[in-house]
Amino acid sequence: MTNSLSAESARVGSGLRIGVLALQGDFREHLRAAAESGAEGVSVRRPRELDGLDGLIIPGGESTAIDKLARAFELAGPLRERIAGGLPVYGSCAGMILLASDIADPATDLSGAPQQTFGGLDMTVRRNAFGRQRESFETDLDFKGLEFSATDADVAPVHAVFIRGPWVERVGPGVEILAQVEPADPEHASHTAELPGAARIVAVRSGRLLATSFHPEVTGEKRVHELFIRMIRGEA
């Protein structure tokens, strides 16, 4: 199932330079999504490649690997500064983890030091919360903020793919919840004791920061990227 952009929406990103953190993960799919919106997609691997960007996407992948590589390439500090300075950023799956202020279950390195994040969103996330790779699942979500895509006053649900995705366990007062989901299989979902029967938060926004637990770039769901572009332009 896909939600392709209309002819008008397909150029919504025209004139924008959108970076995609290209250290690890499915950055190519996000570069393609940026290009399909009419924006210039730019691979970001070095601090200087942050210059001149209108927005940045942090892709899905392994949050621990992206964290380590960002520090190795001396990107972590500049990324934190740009995010704190107001750079619009969209984080998908691992990107959601890296935008969080807190991780409930951070991985640790050989010295016992916990993984780091870039921060920006006042929230606590839990890694791999929906289970292992084989427990990956797809579902339709009611997603706030997509009114621009309404047909006959109705907004079609977002078809979401969850691949070892995180969920959000706490949001601060400035963070808006955009979408929630019931765990597809509570027996496989990790760490459910504290929130029995509760819907899991899987998409949030704060200012010009956007994060989802799922991978819209995998299903051809274009509207989440369009929402991010409209956020960059101040239209959403």
From Swiss-Prot:
Active site per UniProt: 93, 215, 217
GO terms of molecular function: glutaminase activity; pyridoxal 5'-phosphate synthase (glutamine hydrolysing) activity
Coiled-coil residue spans: none
PROSITE patterns in UniProt: PDXT_SNO_1, PDXT_SNO_2
Biochemical pathway: Cofactor biosynthesis; pyridoxal 5'-phosphate biosynthesis
EC assignment: 4.3.3.6, 3.5.1.2
Domain of life: Bacteria
Record bears the keyword Phosphoprotein: no
Swiss-Prot/TrEMBL catalytic activity: aldehydo-D-ribose 5-phosphate + D-glyceraldehyde 3-phosphate + L-glutamine = pyridoxal 5'-phosphate + L-glutamate + phosphate + 3 H2O + H(+); L-glutamine + H2O = L-glutamate + NH4(+)
Alphabetical GO biological process terms: glutamine catabolic process; pyridoxal phosphate biosynthetic process; pyridoxine metabolic process
Binding site for L-glutamine: 61-63, 127, 163-164
Cellular component GO terms held in the UniProt record: cytosol; glutaminase complex
Cross-referenced Gene3D superfamilies: 3.40.50.880
CDD domains cross-referenced by the UniProt entry: GATase1_PB
Alphabetic keyword roster: Glutamine amidotransferase, Hydrolase, Lyase, Pyridoxal phosphate
Subunit and partners: In the presence of PdxS, forms a dodecamer of heterodimers. Only shows activity in the heterodimer.
UniProt function note: Catalyzes the hydrolysis of glutamine to glutamate and ammonia as part of the biosynthesis of pyridoxal 5'-phosphate. The resulting ammonia molecule is channeled to the active site of PdxS.
Family: Belongs to the glutaminase PdxT/SNO family.
Protein name per Swiss-Prot or TrEMBL: Pyridoxal 5'-phosphate synthase subunit PdxT
